[in-house]
Amino acid sequence: MSRVYNFCSGPAALPEAVLKKAQAELLDWHGAGVSVMEMSHRSSEFMSILASAKARLSRLMNISDDYEILFVQGGASTLFSQIPANLANGFESACFLDTGAWSSKAIKEAKKYTKVNVVGSSKAQNYTTVPDFSTLELDESAAYLHICPNETIGGLEFADLPETNLPIVADLSSTILSRKVDVSKYGVIYAGAQKNVGPAGVVICIIRKDLLARSSDDLPAIWNFAHLAENDSMINTPPTFAIYLADLVFEWLEAQGGVEAIEQINIRKAQALYDFIDSSNFYSNPVDPVYRSRMNVPFILADESLEALFLQESEAAGLRTLAGHRSVGGMRASIYNAMPMEGIEALIEFMRGFEERHG
């Protein structure tokens, strides 16, 4: 068996060490005689897994006791509705920064629950840059400000935050644990697992405890952040195996030196790929260099008719899932934490050879 380099935007590659450990423990977790997939979510064994996952994540992100860590079922798209349903209660509106496809989806869903104030948008620039924060039309009486600091489809990322007293709600699905984040500056951080954390099916939700009081008892219990916090994310059976794998990924990340260490690796990976693209007359990236994503690198071939051949030859070379999102086309390399530098080097070597053959 030979594994390929998987550049899928999600579900994304997992560290091979994590997969091997899960494989070794699959039939018998730590002598329990059962798989994690089979054990009761209220057993002492699973409770220890859940506690470990929360503790490791707290260490990795330096999360204070002012925050609650929830493991929410579904994907981040579920939170597009769940967040306004909980946090906009008692408020007339919520503010949103529109920087790409995922911001737009969050805006669309939030409109079903509250008045949405789009305080800034880069749609007119085809989402290749970020609005000037000094021009944002923030309503300080709103429920919160929602942002998506990394847009996977457009390959755009920003690290700075707007100046506001509003709770900042951030979709970090594609950047969580890839770079250092000051959690204390956020009201809510949420992230679907299937990019940098584990398999699909669970969402990490880090919520400032004072915001839990906004959740109304009229909400379904399974959607109520306060009820989820009171029940340690276990109002019903949580996605146990996904949480277990997340804990293994957290363990792996600690062994790499933590978020600070992986961030430096991610900088080197992204810089190498962007440097090659910029040096080429055959490939190009449309995003403002200031806001290029470290996690998702879209690129365009000079001759669009060669795209199918590029994908065919790259897959044959062991470079999987390089097609851009169906809404934008082109190519895209998603290079999350689990992608080693060797994968970037292999991609660059292939791209150089393809250009020599077809450029």
UniProtKB/Swiss-Prot annotation:
InterPro entries: Aminotrans_V_dom (IPR000192), Pser_aminoTfrase (IPR022278), PyrdxlP-dep_Trfase (IPR015424), PyrdxlP-dep_Trfase_major (IPR015421), PyrdxlP-dep_Trfase_small (IPR015422). L-glutamate binds at residues 9, 42. Pfam families: Aminotran_5. GO terms for biological process: L-serine biosynthetic process; pyridoxine biosynthetic process. The keyword Amino-acid biosynthesis applies. Pyridoxal 5'-phosphate binds at residues 76-77, 102, 152, 171, 194, 236-237. Binds 1 pyridoxal phosphate per subunit. GO terms for molecular function: O-phospho-L-serine:2-oxoglutarate aminotransferase activity; pyridoxal phosphate binding. Its main location: cytoplasm. It comes from the Bacteria. Its EC number is 2.6.1.52. Transmembrane segments: none annotated. Catalyzes the reversible conversion of 3-phosphohydroxypyruvate to phosphoserine and of 3-hydroxy-2-oxo-4-phosphonooxybutanoate to phosphohydroxythreonine. Homodimer. Belongs to the class-V pyridoxal-phosphate-dependent aminotransferase family. SerC subfamily. This is Phosphoserine aminotransferase. It comes from Marinomonas sp. (strain MWYL1).
